[in-house]
Amino acid sequence: MLSVREFSNISMIKGPLIYVQGVTDASYNELVEIEMPNGEKRRGLVIDSQMGIAIVQVFEGTTGVSPTGTKIRMLGRGLEVKISEEMLGRIFNPLGDSLDNGPPVIKGEKRDINGSPLNPAAREYPEEFIQTGISAIDGLNALLRGQKLPIFSGSGLPANMLAAQIAKQATVRGEESNFAVVFAAIGARYDDALFFRKFFEETGAINRVAMIVSLANEPPVMKTLTPKTALTLAEYLAFEQDMHVLAILIDMTNYCEALREISAAREEVPGRGGYPGYMYTDLATIYERAGKVLGKKGSITQMPILTMPNDDITHPIPDLTGYITEGQIVLDRALYNKGIYPPINVLMSLSRLAKDGIGEGKTRDDHKDVSNQLFASYARAVDTRGLAAIIGEDSLSEVDRKYLLFGELFERKFVSQGFNENRDIETTLDIGWEILSVLPESELTNIKTQYIKKYHPNYRGKK
């Protein structure tokens, strides 16, 4: 660890950045204390150091900072936040300061928010089902313990509601008491942050939720620190307290915009879409902090939520996120306009690990077959709608008209559910069987006969 060094030769202040001359031994991400002539102190991080100039990113912004009379102290260590199980039920900013008028964290350990590298050979493959209570996720795109599964939303779509509902309802069945949620609100508007807080408090979910919040009007560095602090807490709860932790990060688009703002202030050569060329690597350092570790009982499951600019799934943020994570849940504006909540487009959504965490002994024996059949039948229903728009519904065959009915029931009964409706996996699969029953049995080609005889409404209850 480096010793504390003090400097006073500020060469330039630009946006949230301070350029300090005469620094030859600064470390990347080294914590800095800025003392102004009036005694006010602020904090920052070294984000670059070359040719004797250190660039310091100030947490509280540089407004009011003078190039003369200001002291810069390099503290010889990275940003550390005191972490404790006491943070569950509380709200903090990315620096670990209380935002709920409660006491500071007394008992705890100081941890570097950048985390520790995890040996890939020490990872354990995700295989345990997490029940979110959302049919379109549990039934068709199951979330597994240790997985990273993002939600791609659009401006104005109810991503906040879905995030809050999942945070309230998600659980590992049989281990409910050992489940916690770390909820990171990145660059949130004040009314959104208030919505999350009130919702968790009113529903009682706050007792198992720790909130890490940065607001939209805060400097960009606070937004970049938010997911890192949240995941540092998640790592502590998972790997030292043996808890199953779901980390919900909303909105990762705000994180990437903060990266772009900082990069522009540093006058870096922009990459695709004006974002820094290292954004892929930066996102990977966040998303790869999910997982299970051999020999550890706990786990970290991630659900990053991002807003696709102009609903463009090929935009750099969702595009790069998709490369790193293990699938995606896509919210659809057309479904939202039809009054469907949550407006999940199941045909564009995917959970790459789902097949390993569902079925007999994990959820229910018919889960895989029902999931495959629902996908196939809904895909045909969507194709049939397109055909009906061209030739007219009257020209369709009897079977095609049943697929149209199936498509409508699938959206209204299976995908759509109430904001406070928590469906267990058995209820989800039973609803799937109910809407599949409108199709002839001969069309259920993806389901084994034994499951049709056991679960189909025409046979259920019969000996």
From Swiss-Prot:
GO cellular component: plasma membrane; proton-transporting two-sector ATPase complex, catalytic domain
InterPro entries per the UniProt record, alphabetical: ATP-synt_VA_C (IPR055190), ATPase_a/bsu_AS (IPR020003), ATPase_A1-cplx_bsu (IPR005724), ATPase_F1/V1/A1_a/bsu_N (IPR004100), ATPase_F1/V1/A1_a/bsu_nucl-bd (IPR000194), P-loop_NTPase (IPR027417), V-ATPase_su_B/beta (IPR022879)
GO biological-process terms attached to the record: proton motive force-driven plasma membrane ATP synthesis
Entries under SUPFAM superfamilies matching the protein: P-loop containing nucleoside triphosphate hydrolases (SSF52540)
Keyword DNA-binding: no
Location within or outside the cell: Cell membrane
GO molecular function: ATP binding; proton-transporting ATP synthase activity, rotational mechanism; proton-transporting ATPase activity, rotational mechanism
Gene3D superfamilies with a match to the protein in the record: 3.40.50.12240
Membrane topology type: Peripheral membrane protein
Keywords: ATP synthesis, Cell membrane, Hydrogen ion transport, Ion transport, Membrane, Transport
Source organism superkingdom: Archaea
A Pfam short name: ATP-synt_ab
Family: Belongs to the ATPase alpha/beta chains family.
NCBIfam families: ATP_syn_B_arch, PRK04196.1
Function summary: Component of the A-type ATP synthase that produces ATP from ADP in the presence of a proton gradient across the membrane. The B chain is a regulatory subunit.
Subunit-structure text: Has multiple subunits with at least A(3), B(3), C, D, E, F, H, I and proteolipid K(x).
Protein name in UniProt: A-type ATP synthase subunit B
Taxonomic lineage from the root: Archaea, Thermoproteota, Thermoprotei, Sulfolobales, Sulfolobaceae
Gene name of the encoded protein: atpB
